Amino acid sequence: MAVGIGVVGGAIWIGCCRLNLEARLMTALGLSPDWLGQRDGINPFEFFSGSSELYVFLVARFAILVLAVPIAEELMLRGFLMRYVTDASWESLPLGAVGKIGLIAATGYGVLSHPSEWIAAFIWFTLITLLMMRTKRFWDCVVAHSITNGMLGIYILWAHDWRLW
């Protein structure tokens, strides 16, 4: 289930970004899309002069993207924040026992930490929280997160969509 959610989540994130949904919505509402900000993307093929520097960057970037970020973010969100806002005795609260406040906290974190991709973040963070509530397994969230991030990394290199880097 985690693998499937990771793939679906990655496809949704990439699709939302390719369609530029956030900027379109802001424009339709009469607001400037610049208000959302953008990530400072880097094209590693232009930035690094030597091939060894490029390979080191890509290996490090993918290790961070696929291993470090999913573990750290899921520990903070699922291991702490969602349970903390649900119950003062959060250490003893099982993963699947979080309620609406926990769901809102996790999704709110995702939206606030990815403002230029907030629609994708809203959908993705909700999906991963629902996965956690269904399976009650922390590592399912990490696996789904890793797969989504891996898909995003491959997409970024393939499409040269450096704003997502």
Can you describe what each PLM-predicted range is?
Residues 1-19, 23, 27-38, 45, ...:
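Interfacial transmembrane-helix boundary/kink motif in multi-pass membrane proteins
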Residues 12, 47-165:
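Transmembrane helix-loop-helix hairpins at the membrane interface
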